[in-house]
């Protein structure tokens, strides 16, 4: 019976780890569902505001040079839309990251501005129903 206590601890640890892994999976699945619903709301909002969706899940490429060696990297955007003769690349966000105050969002939008040949970048806040046209100017 000396083995019973360590075995019980082992089973308890295993159950705790399994519970935590299941919780992470459920949280990620919930985030994916929220993202899909937000994307659908954002696409409807863009259409309602007069934008025509040309493509969804757009892929662009950028060359990065490190010490003279070239590397090509893919850049993924949520949509490419047109309004009149102007084309825009679109990033759709939900929650707190839907603001340019969020550093990751700002960097992502700047990457789009450098990668895609469009008239501008649109940030769509799916939760608030807001479309913002984003522009950049270097100050230093």
Stretches with model-predicted labels:
Residues 82, 93-140:
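Nucleic-acid nuclease catalytic cores
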Residues 25-29, 67-68, 96-97:
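Surface-exposed cleft-lining segments at the edges of enzyme active sites
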Residues 31-35, 45, 52-87:
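Active-site metal-binding core of divalent-cation-utilizing nuclease and nuclease-like domains
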